[in-house]
């Protein structure tokens, strides 16, 4: 599994750059979506990918197995959101982490990455806690953002951030 990030508004440009430099694939292959909306490459069934973007940050994970990623800008929201959006177990973790917005987004990005991993989207998994057994997840953090990846392969310890050389 590889996880890349960049400050950009174009996830397609980032994905095209990663495929070209990491896999020798150019141009960007045709994209399709499952009925649930998860993007994939019909011509590259052995390569799974997932994209997330938030306020000028884009994160992309690639793997030979299903994978999900999420990145979110940390911003205050309705005070009731954590209790509404998190499962009881996640809410207990939220309180243990300090019950602040960075703690919420650490847990929320993990949940969203899990939902993207499953390919089902958020609605069918609302109120559930991502499983711990047999799968891998890792959380990442930076100035003003939180992110997570979820999948069947061990994620890298850090995101590989691409600077302006690829644009």
Q: Where on the chain are the PLM-derived regions?
A:
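Core catalytic alpha/beta fold that binds nucleotide/phospho-ligands
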Residues: 1-167
